[in-house]
Amino acid sequence: MWGEPLAAGRARRDPGLGPLDLHVGVSVAIGDDVGHLHDLDRPNRALYIGGMGARDRNFYNDLARRFGYPEAAGTIQDLYLAGRKAEAEAAVPADLL
């Protein structure tokens, strides 16, 4: 999933910058009510999938599509860009959280 984009970026990277460092961020939530825990992360995912970048140039929307969620990614983006953020959040599938 990440190999080709990273290789393409490294090929364009100025060698004077030194080696490329990667940072991975994750969400962690502990509790018995998994649905509630999912709901805590929905606003963040909806923002990234729906609102980060232009409609035709959103890395996170493209990533959700490559993960196998093209319909959900389209719905989330349509709702988010229409200002219907709560509906966009509700449209994030649990498997994407």
Tell where the protein language model's regions lie, with residue ranges.
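Active-site-adjacent structural elements that line small-molecule/cofactor binding pockets in enzymes
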Residues: 1-97
